[in-house]
A protein has these predicted regions:
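Flavin-dependent oxidoreductase catalytic cores
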Residues: 1-305
Length: 305
């Protein structure tokens, strides 16, 4: 019997290598971390994206790099870079719902174009020695579009397919479509993971009981909001303080623009992080204009746990 896997979802701007290392070191509770997508711009793989998945920056962290592409040539360019780095498990993004991506036929926008998906699958399948996983939605503008896509994924023999049961046009609004998810789960010939609206650990147990065929789950925004979500024994203020200290140290080491740049990155985290922290502390974080003021406000927020 295959083990049930819990994976950390990629969130652009949040789950950087700094966040992943801190989470893995202090909180844990997940089996692996899928990275924010890597993409090609002006004919080259973005250096910033490659730096984020560099093995030296992810030492000891079980990482699965994710690529975003609609053209075989772009996909193969990224594959070559990742293979050169030593990666042998790579994830394909067929799920990004954001219009600037999807309206260009990438991410979930590709789900409305099965002929392009077929060409991409053929190109990826030609690469030897790589295991693939896929992150996808039910479709772009129709919740039955997955039916034309699922048979095409067989070319990759994916080790898992993570399904967010909305269509791309919904982005993160509206209800998840569990009836369509159930149908996909029944016909899939490979392991299926569920992703979407998981905010409590107990929900994972419920999903496992309801769907015996389910092979795993992927948890996203709720894990950024509550990093100890899947390791409640580490939900103390001391653990959160250590976690936050690692983020501060990481950004100070990485960024060259001084405290102002570090402050900008740390404040952005609080758009999701610890939403139940006292309003006064959260307001002080938002208004802070120096790293010293920020650190005092952040400590007040964490001390209230």
């Amino acid at each position: 019997m295959q083990p049930f896997i819990i994976s950390a979802a990629p969130l652009q701007g949040y789950t950087t290598h700094i966040w992943r290392r801190a989470h893995h070191a202090v909180m844990g509770g997940v089996d692996d971390y899928t990275t924010p997508f890597i993409r090609v711009e002006r004919g080259a793989v973005r250096r910033h994206d490659l730096a984020d998945v560099a093995p030296a920056m992810n030492d000891g962290v079980p990482v699965v790099p994710q690529i975003l592409a609609c053209e075989p040539a772009e996909a193969l360019l990224m594959m070559n870079e990742l293979i050169r780095m030593g990666y042998r498990h790579i994830d394909l993004n067929l799920g990004c719902p954001f219009p600037p991506i999807a309206l260009h036929g990438k991410g979930s926008g590709m789900l409305a174009q099965p002929e392009r998906v077929a060409k991409l699958m053929a190109a990826l399948a030609s690469v030897d020695g790589v295991r693939y996983s896929v992150k996808m939605r039910l479709g772009w503008d129709d919740d039955s579009q997955w039916r034309a896509i699922v048979p095409l994924l067989d070319a990759l023999n994916p080790v898992r397919v993570v399904v967010h049961p909305r269509i791309g046009r919904q982005q993160y609004g509206g209800e998840v479509n569990m009836p369509q998810f159930e149908q996909l789960l029944k016909v899939a010939g490979w392991p299926v993971f569920y992703n979407g609206e998981i905010t409590r650990r107990e929900q994972i147990d419920g999903l496992r009981q309801r769907y015996p065929l389910l092979s795993g789950v992927m948890v996203g925004r709720a894990l950024v909001a509550h990093p100890a979500l899947l390791s409640p024994e580490r939900a103390s203020a001391d653990h959160y303080r250590t976690f936050h200290d690692l983020l501060v140290t990481g950004y100070r080491s990485l960024l060259t623009g001084g405290d102002h740049q570090v402050l900008s990155h740390l404040k952005a985290l609080w758009q999701l992080f610890l939403p139940d922290a006292p309003a006064r502390a959260r307001k002080a974080i938002k208004k802070s204009t120096s790293l010293t003021a920020y650190l005092a406000a952040a400590d007040a927020a964490i001390s209230a746990l």
